[in-house]
């Protein structure tokens, strides 16, 4: 270790060690170049990179912060990952043998023997008053995660399942294969509702951005090129505007809901109460409106007008802390340069979190949070619990740690004996 040559440094995103052959790819069209046990190096990942990410021994990206796609998905997959490594794709060479120490954010030349810390094997608390949910998307991880001490799935992302289908839904519709898309999506959702039953599974309807949809097979034909997809054609607005594709999704939800009553439906990136009311009507007409409607709160307008949104009639609210933080602070969550400014503990964000939780509590609406912040900042978790949050959702690698944090906070507050 003393003589190890340090090649690249970046931000630790998913802890662990990985050793293997570097494979540099420019986009997801080159996914097949990444074989089992390779070190995936790229500028930035998107949902269509997932097949390659699952095969990688470790992942290194030039750009990104701890809430970027590569960071979130690698933690869920349990793959070591370093983000924001600047010129990694220029410094490292395809075929080069390296060791990735993702716990400390370092890449070394060759096969370096690094001792890893022992991981926690059990939680101190079997149960807490505040529910702990998992953020999940990969069906292959379901048996393992369903056996862990979690109270359900707080965020099942549609994008992972759709990326696995691999084709743009409009392309499948135009080819007369819309029913095939619906059945494949239903099969994916059913994997989760069945494994976690009777624990609830909160399914977030598709929230691909246009640049991500374009990467699906046939996507170039249907997706506009936007200057800023993050605040572009996405979320509830898209679902109303692209009714044909949304119908494929609601058909899948209706199929699953007939079999499993633990399914919940959550609408992402809602901008106005009027928009929410229209989506709710679509869901009611599609026969899935009775399955406990949730909304994501990630746009500042939703925080400010929360009472108006709740008046539309929702059963649950999930705080999308990653998008809410970046939109409140005007910082790019995918930028390594802005990493120090991206902080969920900023007073403006904390004000928003308190307002959301206390308003929901007053109105008798379930409120949760999805994101990494409660795992990173125990002091923030203490605030969330004290304000009355009902549940916290984290990626699978943070389940035991977060259960302990919640338990310690509740014990300190006298909630647990």
Please provide the spans of the model-predicted regions.
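Acidic, glycine-rich flexible loop/linker segments
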Residues: 2-156, 166
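Conserved alpha/beta-domain cores
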Residues: 123-417
């Amino acid at each position: 270790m003393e003589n190890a040559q340090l090649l690249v440094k970046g931000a630790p995103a998913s802890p662990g060690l990985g050793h293997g052959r570097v494979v540099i790819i420019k986009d997801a069209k080159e996914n097949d170049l990444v074989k089992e046990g390779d070190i995936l190096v790229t500028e930035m990942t998107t949902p269509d990179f997932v097949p390659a990410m699952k095969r990688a021994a470790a992942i290194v990206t030039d750009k990104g912060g701890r809430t970027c796609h590569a960071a979130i998905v690698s933690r869920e997959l349990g793959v070591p990952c370093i983000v924001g490594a600047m010129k990694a794709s220029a410094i490292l060479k395809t075929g080069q043998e390296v060791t990735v120490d993702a716990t400390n954010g370092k890449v070394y030349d060759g096969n370096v023997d690094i001792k890893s810390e022992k991981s926690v094997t059990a939680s101190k608390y079997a149960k807490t008053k505040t529910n702990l949910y998992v953020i999940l998307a990969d069906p292959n991880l379901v048996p393992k995660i369903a056996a862990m001490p979690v109270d359900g799935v707080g965020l099942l992302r549609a994008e992972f399942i759709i990326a696995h289908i691999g084709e743009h839904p409009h392309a499948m519709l135009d080819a007369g294969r819309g029913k095939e898309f619906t059945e494949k999506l239903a099969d994916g959702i059913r994997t989760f509702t069945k494994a976690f039953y009777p624990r609830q599974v909160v399914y977030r309807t598709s929230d691909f951005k246009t640049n991500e949809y374009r990467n699906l097979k046939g996507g170039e034909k249907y997706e506009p090129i936007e200057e800023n997809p993050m605040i572009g054609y996405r979320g509830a607005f898209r679902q109303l505007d692209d009714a044909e594709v949304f119908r494929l999704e609601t058909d899948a939800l209706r199929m699953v809901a007939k079999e499993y009553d633990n399914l919940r439906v959550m609408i992402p990136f809602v901008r106005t109460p009027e928009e929410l009311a229209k989506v709710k009507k679509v869901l009611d007409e599609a026969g899935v409106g009775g399955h406990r409607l949730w909304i994501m709160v990630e746009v500042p307008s939703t925080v400010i007008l929360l009472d108006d949104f709740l008046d539309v009639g929702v059963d649950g609210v999930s705080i999308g802390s990653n998008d809410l933080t970046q939109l409140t602070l005007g910082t790019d969550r995918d930028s390594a340069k802005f990493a120090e400014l991206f902080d969920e503990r900023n007073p403006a964000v904390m004000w928003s979190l308190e307002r959301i939780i206390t308003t929901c509590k007053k109105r008798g609406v379930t409120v949760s949070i999805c994101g990494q912040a409660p795992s990173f900042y125990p002091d923030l978790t203490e605030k969330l619990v004290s304000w009355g949050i009902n549940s916290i959702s984290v990626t699978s690698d943070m389940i035991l740690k977060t259960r302990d944090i919640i338990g310690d906070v509740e014990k300190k507050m006298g909630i647990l004996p």
